[in-house]
Swiss-Prot record:
Modified residues (3'-nitrotyrosine): Y550
Gene Ontology BP, a term: Rho protein signal transduction
Xref: PANTHER family: RHO GTPASE-ACTIVATING PROTEIN 190, RHO GTPASE-ACTIVATING PROTEIN 5
GO cellular-component term (any): endoplasmic reticulum
Organism the protein comes from: Homo sapiens (Human)
Key words, A-Z: Cell membrane, Cytoplasm, GTPase activation, Membrane, Nitration, Phosphoprotein, Repeat
Modified residues (Phosphoserine): S590, S765, S951, S968, S1115, S1173, S1176, S1195, S1202, S1218
Entry protein name: Rho GTPase-activating protein 5
Amino acid sequence: MMAKNKEPRPPSYTISIVGLSGTEKDKGNCGVGKSCLCNRFVRSKADEYYPEHTSVLSTIDFGGRVVNNDHFLYWGDIIQNSEDGVECKIHVIEQTEFIDDQTFLPHRSTNLQPYIKRAAASKLQSAEKLMYICTDQLGLEQDFEQKQMPEGKLNVDGFLLCIDVSQGCNRKFDDQLKFVNNLFVQLSKSKKPVIIAATKCDECVDHYLREVQAFASNKKNLLVVETSARFNVNIETCFTALVQMLDKTRSKPKIIPYLDAYKTQRQLVVTATDKFEKLVQTVRDYHATWKTVSNKLKNHPDYEEYINLEGTRKARNTFSKHIEQLKQEHIRKRREEYINTLPRAFNTLLPNLEEIEHLNWSEALKLMEKRADFQLCFVVLEKTPWDETDHIDKINDRRIPFDLLSTLEAEKVYQNHVQHLISEKRRVEMKEKFKKTLEKIQFISPGQPWEEVMCFVMEDEAYKYITEADSKEVYGRHQREIVEKAKEEFQEMLFEHSELFYDLDLNATPSSDKMSEIHTVLSEEPRYKALQKLAPDRESLLLKHIGFVYHPTKETCLSGQNCTDIKVEQLLASSLLQLDHGRLRLYHDSTNIDKVNLFILGKDGLAQELANEIRTQSTDDEYALDGKIYELDLRPVDAKSPYFLSQLWTAAFKPHGCFCVFNSIESLSFIGEFIGKIRTEASQIRKDKYMANLPFTLILANQRDSISKNLPILRHQGQQLANKLQCPFVDVPAGTYPRKFNETQIKQALRGVLESVKHNLDVVSPIPANKDLSEADLRIVMCAMCGDPFSVDLILSPFLDSHSCSAAQAGQNNSLMLDKIIGEKRRRIQITILSYHSSIGVRKDELVHGYILVYSAKRKASMGMLRAFLSEVQDTIPVQLVAVTDSQADFFENEAIKELMTEGEHIATEITAKFTALYSLSQYHRQTEVFTLFFSDVLEKKNMIENSYLSDNTRESTHQSEDVFLPSPRDCFPYNNYPDSDDDTEAPPPYSPIGDDVQLLPTPSDRSRYRLDLEGNEYPIHSTPNCHDHERNHKVPPPIKPKPVVPKTNVKKLDPNLLKTIEAGIGKNPRKQTSRVPLAHPEDMDPSDNYAEPIDTIFKQKGYSDEIYVVPDDSQNRIKIRNSFVNNTQGDEENGFSDRTSKSHGERRPSKYKYKSKTLFSKAKSYYRRTHSDASDDEAFTTSKTKRKGRHRGSEEDPLLSPVETWKGGIDNPAITSDQELDDKKMKKKTHKVKEDKKQKKKTKNFNPPTRRNWESNYFGMPLQDLVTAEKPIPLFVEKCVEFIEDTGLCTEGLYRVSGNKTDQDNIQKQFDQDHNINLVSMEVTVNAVAGALKAFFADLPDPLIPYSLHPELLEAAKIPDKTERLHALKEIVKKFHPVNYDVFRYVITHLNRVSQQHKINLMTADNLSICFWPTLMRPDFENREFLSTTKIHQSVVETFIQQCQFFFYNGEIVETTNIVAPPPPSNPGQLVEPMVPLQLPPPLQPQLIQPQLQTDPLGII
């Protein structure tokens, strides 16, 4: 039972491998491969296969347990699976013969039989014999696997006879074959199966193999298997075949030829190798080790398979090769990277062609090593070559190994670098040459495409040399330059036309009429036309300029950081801070004065005499003054001394003042000259700020002869010099004194010095003063234009270099304070320096006592801005004009500068202002005395200016003004009184081109600052809260929709009828004090949000017209209408005139400077005339009583109420003046009308209206013939509009009658200008807008669609009574149309006919359509008064064309309709056309066709 339950054991076979063995003499120097065959079969893995097995053993090894004193080896057993799935165990025995390593004879064994007999033994026995693995096992059995031969004995079942078929081993094959033959005979006796294994077939000799096969063929059932233990070919086949012969149940053995078996085995190896190499390829780091990688891969089947087939050694070799490849690849990449970096390094170290053009490679290397940046580009390694150092692993170090430069590659890169520099130099030269070529081509305009220019430069040498990309790049750069220049010139042009923009106050919005006026004026300028191809950019610049004009801020100033406001704030912040620091040091040095240091300056011993006199009045150099004792240190200085200046610059002596004594004109001149030297040197070389602020006192010495005639002259000249130097003057007291100097003189002079020092201490005292720093007797505004070609410190240096300059109140960053002696007192003057755009808000809103207007004589725009600003300044405010240029020579050498300087002087002469020139290259610009006369003039007019401001403020009590000044109550602090002198304030002469260097602004003088006031009055009128910035720099209100105002009545002078008319208008719209909204009738208010949207088919109400400007509700300038001219004794300042009641009371109303200057007035007037030059009185629509509103705001610039030519008729009542030019014009018109022939009146005059467009177009406004072709006789724009209307809006109510949005109409035409393939549907515009754009197209044509020449014939044909005859006559006339006009006219009339067919829905009958379209198609002459009686006939002609469209153009039948000439009104009162039919007035024109009649202007304003 137990035996049955046991699993059957697999059959076991013992196979003995035999073959040639013995000594070297017998078998040669190598065996036949028996051991390799056994090794490969038992342990087939490559790592377990040992190719060397020796048979020469020591006695010890031979006696070991492995050999066990036997001449056979036990190789162990192996379980083999057959193809049938049957397992069997095979024990392998190798019969060999071991040789003693000492005697080289076979070892003695228990079996003494020869090898042939031993090998044929079928029973083997050896107790405890161990399995053999390899030669290294002998003696180290414990280190290897120990497996005993089963039971110490085995029975051999078959034999495997090995025959070596390879060449070599010092063995004859025939001897081997004989040995094999004998052995086979012995084996045959055992009756065991035998198979021949031909070994070493990988080195096979074919002849040997054939002999073996021949040997086997002679034997019965003897098989030959070709094997190779090295490549593991057919090894297993040998044993399998033998087992099959032993096991009869198995199939007959199948022997595979060696080549086939070899291919199969190699295929396995190749496949395994590929898979293994793919595994190895996953390793990308060449630093990886085999140990790490093999541990990761050991469980991978592909790895295991390759190890089994090829072994670990080959696997490691494969891995090492891969790692080496990775490293070499890394080095190659680094080398490429270095080589690619070399050009950049060369560009850095050797950028100049001149340096290296003639250097060889070695010289260039030495030059590079000397460069400072060498270490940044290259690294010198201690070990070379670089690719064998660790530098290759420093990925972050991009520096190039210097030894790399020794390669040929690096030298080649250097040569290429030199050639590149040469070619680049040539390319740059050619590009610049091409650039100059482009600059010479005058017709290249900004925005012109390259394709239009390319054909003109094809033959240019430079163009041929450079590439197309370079050509485009150079042209692009040239375009950018000329575009930028054109834009700058365009911007400059806009500033030059400042009068065109600055005639409206801030925060207003320009209307469409104003925009048309601007375009009309500017379109004549070449700089405007220069940007014709960049119309959108030009429009953007214009809108940006307009936006800045009406909403100016320093942040949006067009000059950017060069804005005058920004520059002034920066300069004052730094300069005044330095002044304060200097004075602070002076304060600390001068507190608690007990000792007074004085210089005494004189000539011919006068200084010493005065010093002696003072010492005479002193006791031990101590002087008693006003109850206090002062120690005096006197330093007399003779003006003639050569060491004069060196005596002043001593660190030990710090003077508190200087007494300047004189007794003659000569000595006084010396004093003036040397005081100038002292101040100039102290200011220029900045040796001592103390000396720059030194107070001077002029002292007149008494004459020995008291009746000297020179004394009055000396007194007068001394006072003049004192005023100029802004210092006290001590006169000789009345009476007769025997000595030159009087005690009262010395005391007065000492008091002056002490008070000057005390004043300086008050100015810089760190202790808060009780007096408000903002107190000022005069407030002066200095205006300068942003971007003028001079620095701000140039025009501020007269003030900043003055000893009397100080900072204004905190928060006023653009103001400073001056203390100056004006007249008899020291006055405090606040100077506010602003840009012109910031000054505009000040001009109207703030109390300003005077303006200093600075302009550059090199820049027309600067003068234009000055004119625009000055025109609106009240003529009661004194003005000082300052022209700035480099030197006086500019006047003679530059005509433009001469013209601008002459114009400035001329304007100053006309308005009785002061003018001077400032030369930046002259030191005289640092003088301050040039403004003394201006300040005196301002002081004289101060009360009048403030009263005018007060009255204006009272009239505008509801107006909230903003102040850049921060006024506060003021008190009177008397300082010094001086003798009166009529000529004290004599100023330098005005600018004269033939005089010496004009002294506008002086050298620095004493900086003592005084706190004096003239009036001591308070100004509650204009006090405002403290603010850091004027609010106008921050408020930008949104656009306000326009509100019409009451129009002015057309009168010629202020007569009683005018007064009644105005009073009647005021009665309807009484002024309310609490209202800030301009007066208007309710029905005149525009409900549309779009201020520019007119209605082109409805007449404006009679008596009203389009506004040129639209003023928002909160504008600072509102239109004021007085309730009565008689009762209102305090008239409106803005009217610019005094009414008769005011005049009778002796009060002169202030006007504007533009009415005092013919130059200023003519400039503004010329703009208006240029804009409206194409519209005479006769060209206006005569039946319309509407009158164009003046350009000027409200009544402030009402030409009826403003002085025009004050140089002719005075300014108090300018209305009585007449314009001789207009009177002559009217007389000529009357004479011309009397002589006019009646026939000429009947002739039709071409009416060419101004275009409604404000942009350049190459389509709209072109002749019709230029827009069509024979293939496309209809203009594309007309087709698109008609198709859009018929597809989307044929049933729109009021089509062609209701006006579309003008902005949309303009956009449609602009978009079409840019792209003729536009899709109107995608633009999302209304049908009415497209209809309006279509009408505008025909209105802009140079000639009407219905030719003027056929108008009389159409008129005559329309009068024919018989309908049929009338229609045929009209048809014949239509055939006379030009073919182009005929095609388009037919297309349009057909379209209108389709519209009229939907009249029940769109309410547009043929009659209504004709009313809307006939003025557009016929362009009538409205100036012909006889035309008014025929307007209905013209309309009926167009109506007939629409109704009888089929008859006229398509040979259709006549349609029966009502009376064409005078159709009755429709019976349906609800239709829109009802109010249009009975009108006997001509139908409305499109807006662009209406030219309002310009009424006669008696004052010549327009």
